[in-house]
Amino acid sequence: MQNFNYPHLSYWQKEIQNRDFEHNRNAQPSRLCAVDVIKAISNYTKTLLPIVATEVGQHQVAVVNNFEINEPRKLLTSGGFGAMGFGFPAAIGACVWQDKFPVICITGDGSFQMNLPELAVCMDYNLPVKVFIINNGSLGLVRQLQEEQCEERYFETAISSPDYVKLSQSYGIDAIRVDKHCDIMPALECAFKNKSPFVVEFMTVSDEKV
């Protein structure tokens, strides 16, 4: 927000900049949380000025609260409609539209299953989209709502997923899986050194709150 100057909003801008977005994430050193992953991606790509597309869910909230984006038209997200399946096609479109900035798709294991066959488009046209899957084994935002507003009466939020690494590789796309904090940065280095599409699956906790 430092690049925008709206005097009548100065108090609110200061409030946002000073606000601590750390929520109860049930964080433990041995557990990988989505917020930690998002912050790591943001820090790594700060000088790359990426275009960031998100799907819909907890990862989307984590991106909005923790990913540093200081330029217009750099965040593509379905905020009003909340349409799962929006982010990956949006990232592909951004890649087709321009090649100056890297394009990132941050998605969840639920949302990615809406449009994962589009991996074929990335491969066919060699679109270097970096897909980061936050896999918590659930529809996390719905689960959080059921926990907080429905007295933990969980219903249809735990989901099964394919092996995203093998699935990506079956399309001819390189992919790796990360389940430890120490492996986040090496995975990002590997993804961005690769000039082709690349998938990283982050295995995160299922009880995180954002």
Residue ranges and their predicted role:
Residues Q13-P89, A94:
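Active-site diphosphate/adenylate-binding microenvironment
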